[in-house]
Amino acid sequence: MLQQVMTNPGEIIFREVPVPEVKDDQVLVKIMNIGICGSDIHVYHGKHPFTKYPVTQGHEVSGEIAKVGKDVTEFHEGQKVTIEPQVYCGQCYPCRHGKYNLCEELKVMGFQTTGTASEYFAVDASKVTPIPEDMSYEEGAMIEPLAVAVHGVKQVGDVKGLNIAVLGAGPIGNLVAQAAKGMGAAKVMITDVSDLRLDKAKECGIDACVNTMEKDFGEAMVEAFGPDKADVIYDCAGNNITMGQAIKYARKGSIIVLVAVFAGMATVDLAVANDHELDIKSTMMYRHDDYVDGIELVNEGKVHLRPLISKTFAFKDYLKAYQYIDDNRETTMKVIINVQEK
């Protein structure tokens, strides 16, 4: 079978390797689609701090079960699935308490261990989640980033009836806004400096879409929610400007959730956060229930994935996909690799 390998930053080869053997508790997945995310782009540019080369990528994935191990009873051949890419020890304190996304030895497929970018991939059945038969494989590859969003939204508990502001309308910000709305938020506002991204958010049903190059964030919150402003602000941009906006304009005693990963050291006014008794939370990846809840939101028509798909590339055009993203960064949301198209 064919397998993608990034040998060095910006260099991709394809090699023939044997189809993997399936252990008793595993399934063999015929890989259909793979999404490229911001972390993959960091690997492509040699800027991911926890990835060594060579590496086979692919952690946002959909596929079809081609074979099941003899001890696997919950899956069958031909079933549509997605894969949770976390590899965890199961022994550390977080793992023992159900928080394996915080494992002390956490590895992620496509970064610290072999990813799914091959025609077939053998994986523990426990890491496989079924997707509906009427869900496209492109959408199935986007369940992983949706799970990130769902997990982030859940960090504040139940969002029903809350007013939510989301900073950053890229793929994750868009999905956080959609997930919050789908999970019962009263009203959701999203901000960005890109009209294209804001138009995508509007297409996905977000209530208020604000370009902060044209309108002050604090003013926009009052306009959207009234003088009480937002109950929760999700920072999905991850820079000093957006975090500074969140701290400056958050209602006293409200919540800020850090969803985006900061590229460098954050320099924000924590004195204001302290004085205003702001509850600053963070979020890390997801767990199985976030996959299940995300799939349900899509199935119920509360989250729309297809508008986020910008372009699809054939498997052997993996490098062209990265080049396309670099050349069209301002107009690209999500690029998908079709593994079965060579």
Report the location of each language-model feature:
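C-terminal hydrophobic helical "lid"/dimerization subdomain
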Residues: Q3, G244-K248, H288-K342
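N-terminal glycine-rich cofactor-binding segment
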Residues: Q3-E21, G38-K67, T82-I83, Y100-T114
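Glycine-rich beta-strand-centered segment in the early N-terminal region that forms part
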Residues: P20-I34, K47-Y93, K127, P132-D134
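NAD(P)H dinucleotide-binding glycine-rich loop of Rossmann-like/cofactor-binding domains
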Residues: C89-L167
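Mid-domain Rossmann-like dinucleotide-binding core that forms the NAD(H)/NADP(H) cofactor-binding site
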Residues: M135-E214
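Glycine-rich cofactor phosphate-binding loops and adjacent beta1-alpha1 units
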Residues: V156-K160, D199, C204-D279, L319
